[in-house]
């Protein structure tokens, strides 16, 4: 094969690959600007399962918290989201400290605690009611967020109940929702490295 033709083919492949990546980046930002998409994110790395006995939501020292690696992951995800073209976002967090820390480290303008994102790991019987509350919150927020991204930082159990997807720490689910806040379809977005 002529080396010049081979180089041209490689160059065209590289251009196509870059264009594909840029299109995907713009696609995420564009979807999150619409009223029918929301990004659910599992908090970043907090080693262990559940919380210690006798934990309280008002005292982070009693909870399972982000590790140093988890804090770095949250900061990196915030950078990645901005590199995808997401410059404005309404960020909401579960009341658990590992979620609040993840939300803060994303470094969007501000974030707020939202009770419907609270974990029901300690009492799985709460799953249906909690999911209905989350759907109601999503339905309300997608109507009022304008073109800002809606980012919800929560827990594995909440995302599994909402989307039926097992996800790792820092993974995200881009959910298309209907007017009632119910998921129509979703795309798993693994934690960027």
Identify the meaning behind each predicted range:
Residues 36-38, 146-154:
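Generic beta-sheet signal
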Residues 18-23:
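N-terminal signal peptide c-region/cleavage motif recognized by signal peptidases
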Residues 2-11:
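Bacterial N-terminal signal peptides that target proteins for export
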Residues 125-133:
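Short, surface-exposed amphipathic charged segments that create phosphate/polyanion-binding patches used
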Residues 26-115, 120-124, 165-193:
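Active-site-proximal alpha-helix that buttresses catalytic centers in soluble enzyme cores
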């Amino acid at each position: 094969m002529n080396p010049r033709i081979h180089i041209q083919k490689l160059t065209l492949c590289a251009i196509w690959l870059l264009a594909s990546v840029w299109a995907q980046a713009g696609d995420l930002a564009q979807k999150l600007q619409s009223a029918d998409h929301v990004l659910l994110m599992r908090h970043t790395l907090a080693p262990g399962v559940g919380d210690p006995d006798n934990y309280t939501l008002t005292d982070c020292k009693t909870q399972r918290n982000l590790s140093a690696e988890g804090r770095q992951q949250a900061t990196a995800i915030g950078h990645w989201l901005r590199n995808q073209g997401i410059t404005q976002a309404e960020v909401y967090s579960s009341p658990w400290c590992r979620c609040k820390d993840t939300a803060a480290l994303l470094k969007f303008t501000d974030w707020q605690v939202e009770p419907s994102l609270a974990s029901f790991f300690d009492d799985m019987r709460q799953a249906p009611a909690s999911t209905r509350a989350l759907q109601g919150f999503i339905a309300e927020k997608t109507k009022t967020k304008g073109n800002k991204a809606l980012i919800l930082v929560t827990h594995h159990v909440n995302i599994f109940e909402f989307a039926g997807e097992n996800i790792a720490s820092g993974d995200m689910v881009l959910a298309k929702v209907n007017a009632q806040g119910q998921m129509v379809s979703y795309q798993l977005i693994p934690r960027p490295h």
